[in-house]
Amino acid sequence: MRHVTIKADTAFTKGRIDDRIYGSFVEHMGRVVYTGIYEPLHKTADENGFRGDVLQKVRQMGVTAVRYPGGNFVSNYDWRDGIGPVEKRPRKRDLAWKSIETNEVGLDEFMK
């Protein structure tokens, strides 16, 4: 069996890591997007359908950057499917999460 030993000297610093590097990502999994951050009929939804209560909590967490889309969802994602008129966007099988992706929320909506 192989062993690895790591020693960290907390008195030695190379430099400071900018706090803006710490971010998060949004993945189309479960209720993260649909009925999560995006729910047009929710009482706190803005004109783009994003929930104000969820966005407020994200701001309180201090997230400085959000990658969209993220996670395993991107393994089958084509950015062109999430732009243009929503009614003309293709519905596709999401191979990562075994569901149907409606592309109701895409890059156009997220970047607003």
Task: Please state what every model-predicted region is.
Residues 1-112:
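Non-catalytic accessory regions flanking glycosidase/transglycosidase catalytic cores in CAZymes
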